[in-house]
Amino acid sequence: MTNIRKSHPLAKIINESFIDLPAPSNISAWWNFGSLLGVCLIIQILTGLFLAMHYTSDTMTAFSSVTHICRDVNYGWIIRYIHANGASMFFICLFMHVGRGVYYGSFTFTETWNIGILLMFTVMATAFMGYVLPWGQMSFWGATVITNLLSAIPYIGTNLVEWIWGGFSVDKATLTRFFAFHFILPFIISALAAVHLLFLHETGSNNPSGVVSDSDKIPFHPYYTIKDILGLLLLILVLMLLVLFSPDLLGDPDNYIPANPLNTPPHIKPEWYFLFAYAILRSIPNKLGGVLALILSILILAIVPLLHTSKQRSMMFRPLSQCLFWLLVADLLTLTWIGGQPVEHPFITIGQLASILYFSIFLILMPVSGIIENRLLKW
C-alpha cells in the first residue's frame, strides 16, 4: 500500500513541494530566505487579522483605535509591534533573497524571476498602504506625497490622483479604501507566492556553483527542513529582540502625532525599506522623470536576464562581477542613507551620483564585466 502522502491528492502536492522535493546537495544559507519570506507572510497575515478586529478605518477614530490596541487590548501592543517590525524583517529577507538571485544567477529562471518582481511590487504596495493606516503625521503626508506622484502622468494624472483619493485630498475615503486593499493584498501575495513556487519546481533550484545539479540531488526533508528551522529561529530571535527591546527603532516619531492636514512635518520620508527608491526619485529634478526612475529602480531587475553576457551563470568564480555586486550593495546602502536626509547640499549631489551608479551597474558595468570575464577564460 502506498504512503498516504504519495496517494492523497492534497498531501501529494505538499509532499512534492516540501518533503520528497529533489534539492541540490550544496545550497547554502542564502537559500533560506525563500522559506523565511513565507514565514514572514504568515506572521503578517495572522497579526494583521487580529489588528483588523480592533482597528477602525475612519479618519476620526483610526489613530485612537491604534492607541486603544496598544493600551487596552490583551497583548495588543505586542501584536501591533510584531506586525510593524515584521514588515521590516519581511523587507530584509526580500532584499537578501533578490540579492542572492542576482549574485548566483537565479534570474535565468525567467518565469520564476518575473513573478518574483511582481511579488516585490505587490509587497511594496501593501507596505505603503499599511503605513497610512495608523493615521499619524507621516502616514497622512506620506500618502499625500506618494499618491501625488501619479499626477505626473500626462493628461490623465490629476483625474487619476483624485480617483484614488476618492475626493480632492487624502481623507476618509482614501483611508477606508487603503484599509480594504491592505487587507486583501496579502492573500493575493500568497497566491502569487504559490505560482512563484510552481514555476521554481518546474526547473528545480539553482545552486551556488550555477552548474546543473540533476546528478546530485537530495530530498528536501529532512536536510533542508532542519536548515530552514535554524533560519526561522534566527529570524524570530531578531524580530523579538526588535519588538521587545526597541520596537520604535525603525519607525518615525512623527507618526505618534495624529494626522494634521494644516501642519507639514519638516522632513517627509517613507519607512526605511523605501528610502533607496525615494532617493532615486528625489535625485531627478523633473517630476515625471523622477516617477519613471522610481518605477525603473525595481523594474530594472526584469532586464537583468537579458543583459547577462557571461558564460558562467553564478558569480562564484567571477571576481570582477563580485566587485560590482558589492559595489551595488554599498550603493544601495548609500541611497538608503540619502533618502532619509533633507534635500540640501551635499546630499543632493551624493544622491544623484549614487542613482547614476545604480543604473550604470545594471545597464553597463555588469554586461561589460561579463564580456571581459569571458575573454579571461581563454587566456
Swiss-Prot record:
Its cofactor is heme b. The chain crosses the membrane at residues 33-53, 77-98, 113-133, 178-198, 226-246, 288-308, 320-340, 347-367. Binds 2 heme b groups non-covalently. GO terms for cellular component: mitochondrial inner membrane; respiratory chain complex III. Keywords: Electron transport, Heme, Iron, Membrane, Metal-binding, Mitochondrion, Mitochondrion inner membrane, Respiratory chain, Transmembrane, Transmembrane helix, Transport, Ubiquinone. It is found in: Mitochondrion inner membrane. Heme b b562 binds at H83, H182. One of its GO terms (molecular function) is ubiquinol-cytochrome-c reductase activity. A ubiquinone binds at H201. Its main location: mitochondrion. Gene3D superfamilies: Cytochrome Bc1 Complex, Chain C. PANTHER family: CYTOCHROME B. Component of the ubiquinol-cytochrome c reductase complex (complex III or cytochrome b-c1 complex) that is part of the mitochondrial respiratory chain. The b-c1 complex mediates electron transfer from ubiquinol to cytochrome c. Contributes to the generation of a proton gradient across the mitochondrial membrane that is then used for ATP synthesis. Belongs to the cytochrome b family. This is Cytochrome b. It comes from Genetta pardina. The lineage of its organism: Eukaryota, Metazoa, Chordata, Craniata, Vertebrata. The gene is MT-CYB.
